[in-house]
Amino acid sequence: GGHHGNASQHCANAIHQLAYTITEIHKLASPMPGAPEDFTAEALKARGIVDAGQFIPQNTVNVGVIGSTNDKISVIPGDAFCEVNIRCFSTAEQARIDEEIKALADKVVIAGTKVSITGGMVTGPMEKTPQVQKMVDIYKAVVKEEFGGEVNEWVAGGLTDGNRTAKFIPTLDALGVENYDEHTDHESVDLKTAVPRTAAFAITL
């Protein structure tokens, strides 16, 4: 870095390069289904849609953190970084995104800068295999026979221990109690769902 007024001619702006790199990262994301306001919980409920997960794109990309050691607007930043979160529904898509992001290290637009990519995919997706479908069918049959209920099969973009176990064994997830406002300080559960869901899980086993 250097002084913006006196050293622009021999300094390279790392944040400027990072802006280009972030733009390229977001180009890898699957297109969204439409205007965000049409897919809030309230909007979907008004349309009678139960499975909100069906609208989650094949992959989602989020540059959630950016930064630099520079804290003065009169100084050309010599470093900058970002942290990226990627979610995919298939291992093939995950591998493709990983490869394309790493290739961005060679995509330097601002002369005098360089791009370094560190890290990688940490946890795999929980793919729906034929074995998983068989387990889903068994669980649905148990709920119908024992409680006369119907199971809404959801797709979700979150991350749980199920993502880790799915790498080794067929896995069903989210069979616990109904909850609301997850990851907030006012998260709550519906206790009326505790007994039937626990019983259905035990019978399935």
Positions of PLM-derived features:
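Metal-dependent amide/peptide-bond hydrolase catalytic core
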Residues: 1-205
